[in-house]
């Protein structure tokens, strides 16, 4: 109820200004009496996935805390894990504004942010300072001005810098807002990326005496033969997990709505069904070879359960959290 009242005011603001204000307030309130407005003491629902123990299976998806500024605040809300980023080797401002739009009647969001972030070094410092007893995933990407044929180098740079501070590393090759990025999901480009990531992972595991799992984040806009090829590559290169899915370019669910024609990736309830279909198909293809983290339109316990029945072992929320607030985390954790 409290969040519903607050949301009415928040939604009067431009979407990106509201996001920035929320991040500022989470930083300001954390550890003060004011964090009572979002702090939740939830029951432990431990699960082990990718060799990591999570205190519950509900995580924050990447994109909300790009620079790792509010890890403790999100932990206070009850998330079992927090995925920060996407982060790139060098700071970049992202695409031109406006670049974030609410589709309120569909409970969706369109973004064309373009990996705006303060760079991997800044994020690492924030992660090192965070006092959070959950799992921190770090989502990595490539800089916009890095040619796609050299994109693997950016992922390896980020991987080396975040490795010893990450609970797991998420490799984002599925954002529609960086030109050419999604081509890394296919054929030889994918195989080359995965083989080099595994080599680097082995090297870093020996260097630090610590094995950090790597998960690949994929798009929902894939044909069945493309999903099949991705699954085969994930198994071939012994990737530790897959995150399904990122945002969609499909607008069939929101035709005629305000902002529906804006360029960018659509998230929230409109992508719920398709992302669940991808999770289900991946489970058929992967079997027990590697776990699936389900994300896309999770806005209730029922939606989270659908992802898990389809084959996900962990779930993540983002758009649903924007529309429902911290109570969504409580609802899922208490009923899962």
UniProtKB/Swiss-Prot annotation:
It is found in: Cell membrane. Substrate binds at residues 66, 111-115, 172, 177, 246-247. GO terms for cellular component: cytoplasm; plasma membrane. InterPro entries: Aldolase_TIM, DHO_dehydrogenase, Dihydroorotate_DH_1_2, Dihydroorotate_DH_2, Dihydroorotate_DH_cat, Dihydroorotate_DH_CS. The active site is at residue 175. It catalyses: (S)-dihydroorotate + a quinone = orotate + a quinol. It is an enzyme of class 1 (oxidoreductase). Pathway: Pyrimidine metabolism; UMP biosynthesis via de novo pathway; orotate from (S)-dihydroorotate (quinone route): step 1/1. Its main location: membrane. FMN binds at residues 62-66, 86, 139, 172, 217, 245, 268, 297, 318-319. HAMAP family: DHO_dh_type2. This is Dihydroorotate dehydrogenase (quinone). It comes from Aliivibrio fischeri (strain ATCC 700601 / ES114). The lineage of its organism: Bacteria, Pseudomonadati, Pseudomonadota, Gammaproteobacteria, Vibrionales.
